[in-house]
């Protein structure tokens, strides 16, 4: 079988490939305008760590200024990204005391993003267990918390 117009065949093939690439690229979402640029620091107790895709979740209880316990969610890297830097389900366990720093959602809900300019300190060992730069390349330089708590 002879191809009548190779330009049409090439253009069709290129269109299919570009369409597939655009579909893949659109699978992720932006968060422009969703989070405060100011860094929020919280100290609390781990309730659960969910190493899942597309974003892992750290759930922790934090005491507010009035002494009431507020349940916070912290969203960060996917399970594969965390595994590459040595994370397992044992890295943070229920009951661990942590200090986290990240960008809070603008709505004021108890939700924080740890994907960039973020850190997690495990207070028992005063260990810096997560910096967003470990995966994404930025390297926040926040001081370590007072681990004598």
Which stretches of residues belong to each language-model region?
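Short aromatic-glycine-enriched beta-strand elements
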Residues: 52-63
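Short nucleic-acid-contacting surface segments enriched for D/E, G, S/T with interspersed K/R
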Residues: 84-100
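Glycine- and charge-enriched low-complexity intrinsically disordered segments
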Residues: 135-149
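Conserved hydrophobic positions within beta-strands
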Residues: 44-46
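Bacterial N-terminal signal peptides
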Residues: 10-22
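Short, structured beta-strand/loop micro-motifs enriched in basic residues and often containing a Trp
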Residues: 75-84
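Short boundary/loop segments of OB/S1/cold-shock single-stranded nucleic-acid-binding domains
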Residues: 25-40
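OB-fold/S1-family single-stranded nucleic acid-binding modules
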Residues: 105-135
